[in-house]
C-alpha cells in the first residue's frame, strides 16, 4: 500500500528546502513601469497583474501530533484526512491548498508539500508493518521543510488566504499572536473548526488544565475568527450561547456542517483481511455488541455496565452477548473500572480494547449485532455515523447532538435512564425479528454522504468567508476603566471579555506563553497594544502597569505611542532580582490606541534548558485620574507596593507624568 513512500523519501532532489527559493520580485510602482515602457520604443507593455486567488491554509498541527503517537487515526483525525485529501486532489483548483503544521521546537508553522501530505494520508490508510520504517522517516523529515512565511512569499500580495484548523489548536503557545502577525503581511481570514463546547458545558468531565486552556482559547477565537465551522446544530447553538454571553453585540458567522460521511467506503475494503484479528478477540461466532468511544467519565460507561449486570441477572450469562468497548483510556474512568472489579460476572462478557486497525474496526462494525453509544454530552457522535454507514443499527442516548448524528435511523433510549436502556437492550438482543426490522429501517433512513460531498460543503463555506474579526474587535473590545487586567492565565472567575482582552493586548511574537502569574517577554522589544475607550479626549487618565524582574537585575526601556506616533520615552529603569515595579503613567490623550514598547534588552536565562526572557508583565489598569477607589484597588491587589515593602526595597512604585502631545 505504501509502495511509493520509499521513492518519495529518496528522490534525488529531496523534499527538504535547505533555503527558500527566491521570492517574487516586488512590482514596480505604476509610474515607474510606464517610464520603462516608454524608454524602449516598440517594447511590449508590461503584463497586467495576476488576478487575486483564494488559498486555503490547512493547519494540521494536531493531526501531526496525533500521528507521532499513533499511525491509526481516530474519528476527528479521519475527518481531517478525508476533507483535506479532497481539497488537495479533486478540489485543488478551488482551494489552491497550503498545508502547514506548527513545529514546537522551531516555534513556527512549517509548510508540508502536498505530496508529503498525500503520503501521510496513504500511510494512515495502510498498516503494513514493512512500511513502518518509511512512515517514521516521513514523520521525522517534517521539521526540515520551509517556514510558512517564506512559502507565502511566493504568492501574489493580492491573494486571499484562509487559515483553517479542522482539529484543535488551543494547546499551541500564543496561537492568536501568530495569526495577528500573519495578518500584518497578508489578507488572512481565520476559520477554526469547533467540534464542541464540552469543556465549557460539562467541565466536571474534563481535566482542569484542559478546561482552562480551552476557555482561554475559545473566547480569544470568538474575537479572532472571521467565521466558525462546527459539526452540528447543537454545537452551533452552544457556540452562539457563549459568544452572546461574553460579547452581546458580536456578530459571527457559525456554519454547522454534519459529519455524516461514509466511513464504510474508507474502512470496509480492509475488513476481510482483519477477520483473524477479530476472532482472536472473541470465541468463534460469539455474538457481540460494539461500543466505540474513549474510556472516560463523560461516555457514561458505568450505565452500560449496570445494564449488562442486569441482563446477566435476568437471563443468565450464556444468553447475554459480549460488550466490546473500543477506545483509549481517558479522563476519570475510575467509577466504571471499580464497578467491573466489584462484579466478576462481567469479566466474561465485557472486553475493553484500547486500539485496533481500521480494518479490524470495520470488521467489528459489520459483525456486531448492533452498536451502542452512550454519553452525557457530545458535539456530534462519529461512532453513530460510522455504525450507520456500515448498515449497522445503533442504540443511542437521546441527548445533545446524538439525535442529529442518529437522525431517523437510530434507536434511542432516554438519557441516563437504566430502566429504558435495559428494556431497549432486551428488545434488540432477544427479539431478532424486531432487531432486523429496525436494522432495515436504519439502512433505509440513514443520512450518509460521500466524504467528497462533505468536503465540498466545507470548502464552499470557507471560501465564502468575508473578513469580520477586526470589526468585531473594534466593536466589542475596549480597555475597561478601573478594571485590573491580568496578562497571564486568567482565573476561572474572570469575565470572558477580560480574558480575551488580556490575550489580545500582547501584540507580536516577542512574548512567551501566559503563565498563572503573567507573561514573560522575550529578549528585545515586546509590545502592548491597548484599545482605548471612546471618551479619552480632554480627560486625565492614569495607566497602571505592574512588572516583574527575572533572576538577575534587568535594565528596561519603555517607549509610549499614541495611534502609532511616539509621544514619550524612552523611560529607562532597572528592575532588581525578583523585584516588582509599578509604573503609574499620568496622561491625557485623544487617541484610539495606546502602545507600549517594552525593551527587556539581551535577556536572562531562566535556567538550564529553559527560556531566555526579558521582563515579566503581570497586570495593567486604566482609570480616571481622580478615581481614588480604582487606585486603592490596585494597591490592595498588590500589597508589595505598600509603604513598608517599598522601604525594604522589595518593590518600587513610581508615577510618571506624560505631557499632552
Regions found by a protein language model. Give the residues of each.
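Carbohydrate transferase catalytic cores enriched for Leloir-type hexosyltransferases
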Residues: 2-22, 26-502, 506-523, 557, ...
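Extracellular and analogous surface-interaction loops
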Residues: 526-539, 584-590
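A short beta-strand element within beta-rich, extracytoplasmic domains
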Residues: 537-556
Amino acid at each position: 500500500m505504501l509502495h511509493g513512500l520509499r521513492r518519495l523519501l529518496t528522490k534525488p532532489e529531496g523534499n527538504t528546502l535547505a533555503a527558500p527559493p527566491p521570492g517574487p520580485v516586488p512590482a514596480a510602482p505604476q509610474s515607474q513601469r510606464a517610464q520603462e515602457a516608454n524608454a524602449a520604443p516598440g517594447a511590449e507593455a508590461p503584463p497586467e497583474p495576476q488576478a487575486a486567488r483564494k488559498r486555503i491554509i490547512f493547519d494540521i498541527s494536531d493531526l501531526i501530533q496525533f500521528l507521532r503517537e499513533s499511525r491509526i487515526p481516530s474519528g476527528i483525525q479521519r475527518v481531517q484526512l478525508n476533507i483535506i485529501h479532497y481539497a488537495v486532489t479533486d478540489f485543488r483548483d478551488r482551494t489552491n491548498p497550503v498545508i502547514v503544521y506548527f513545529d514546537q521546537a522551531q516555534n513556527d508553522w512549517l509548510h508540508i508539500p502536498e505530496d508529503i501530505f498525500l503520503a501521510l494520508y496513504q500511510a494512515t490508510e495502510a498498516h503494513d508493518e514493512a512500511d513502518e520504517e518509511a512512515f517514521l522517516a516521513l514523520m521525522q523529515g517534517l521539521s526540515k521543510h520551509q517556514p510558512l512565511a517564506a512559502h507565502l512569499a511566493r504568492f501574489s500580495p493580492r491573494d486571499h488566504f484562509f487559515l483553517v484548523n479542522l482539529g484543535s489548536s488551543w494547546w499551541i503557545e500564543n496561537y492568536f499572536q501568530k495569526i495577528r502577525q500573519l495578518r500584518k503581511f497578508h489578507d488572512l481570514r481565520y476559520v477554526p473548526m469547533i467540534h464542541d463546547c464540552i469543556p465549557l458545558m460539562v467541565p466536571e468531565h474534563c481535566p482542569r488544565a484542559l478546561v482552562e486552556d480551552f476557555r482561554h482559547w475559545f473566547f480569544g477565537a470568538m474575537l479572532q475568527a472571521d467565521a466558525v465551522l462546527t459539526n452540528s446544530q447543537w454545537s452551533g447553538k452552544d457556540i452562539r450561547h457563549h459568544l452572546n454571553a461574553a460579547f452581546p453585540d458580536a456578530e459571527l458567522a457559525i456554519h454547522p456542517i454534519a459529519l455524516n460521511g461514509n466511513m464504510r467506503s474508507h474502512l470496509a475494503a480492509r475488513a476481510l483481511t482483519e477477520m483473524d484479528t477479530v476472532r482472536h478477540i472473541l470465541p468463534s461466532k460469539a455474538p457481540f455488541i460494539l461500543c466505540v468511544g474513549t474510556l472516560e467519565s463523560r461516555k457514561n460507561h458505568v450505565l452500560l455496565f449496570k445494564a449488562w449486570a442486569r441482563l446477566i441477572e435476568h437471563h443468565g450469562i450464556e444468553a447475554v452477548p459480549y460488550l466490546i468497548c473500543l477506545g483509549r483510556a481517558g479522563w476519570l474512568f475510575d467509577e466504571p473500572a471499580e464497578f467491573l472489579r466489584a462484579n466478576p460476572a462481567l469479566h466474561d462478557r465485557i472486553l475493553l480494547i484500547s486500539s485496533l486497525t481500521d480494518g479490524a474496526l470495520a470488521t467489528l462494525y459489520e459483525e456486531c449485532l448492533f452498536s451502542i453509544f452512550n454519553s452525557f454530552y457530545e458535539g456530534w457522535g462519529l461512532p453513530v455515523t460510522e455504525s450507520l454507514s456500515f448498515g449497522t443499527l445503533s442504540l443511542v442516548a437521546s441527548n445533545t447532538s446524538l439525535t442529529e448524528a442518529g437522525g431517523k435511523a437510530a434507536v434511542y433510549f432516554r438519557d441516563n435512564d437504566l430502566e429504558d436502556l435495559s428494556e431497549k437492550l432486551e428488545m434488540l438482543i432477544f427479539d431478532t425479528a424486531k432487531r432486523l426490522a429496525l436494522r432495515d429501517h436504519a439502512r433505509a433512513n440513514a443520512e450518509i454522504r460521500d466524504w467528497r460531498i462533505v468536503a465540498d460543503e466545507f470548502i464552499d463555506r470557507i471560501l465564502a468567508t468575508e473578513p469580520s474579526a477586526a470589526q468585531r474587535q473594534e466593536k466589542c473590545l475596549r480597555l475597561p476603566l478601573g478594571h485590573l487586567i491580568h496578562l497571564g492565565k486568567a482565573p476561572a472567575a474572570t469575565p470572558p471579555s477580560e480574558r480575551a482582552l488580556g490575550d489580545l493586548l500582547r501584540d507580536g511574537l516577542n512574548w512567551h506563553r501566559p503563565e498563572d502569574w503573567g507573561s514573560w517577554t522575550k529578549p528585545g522589544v515586546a509590545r502592548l497594544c491597548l484599545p482605548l475607550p471612546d471618551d479619552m479626549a480632554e480627560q486625565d487618565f492614569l495607566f497602571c502597569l505592574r512588572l516583574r524582574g527575572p533572576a538577575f537585575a534587568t535594565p528596561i526601556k519603555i517607549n509610549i505611542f499614541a495611534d502609532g506616533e511616539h509621544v514619550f520615552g524612552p523611560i529607562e529603569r532597572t528592575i532588581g532580582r525578583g523585584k516588582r515595579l509599578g509604573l503609574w503613567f499620568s496622561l491625557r490623550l485623544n487617541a484610539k490606541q495606546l502602545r507600549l514598547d517594552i525593551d527587556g534588552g539581551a535577556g536572562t536565562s531562566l535556567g538550564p534548558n529553559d527560556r531566555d526572557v526579558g521582563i515579566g508583565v503581570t497586570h495593567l489598569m486604566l482609570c480616571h485620574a481622580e478615581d481614588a477607589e480604582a487606585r486603592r484597588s490596585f494597591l490592595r491587589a498588590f500589597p508589595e507596593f505598600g509603604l513598608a515593602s517599598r522601604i525594604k526595597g522589595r518593590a518600587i512604585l513610581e508615577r510618571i507624568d506624560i505631557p499632552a502631545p
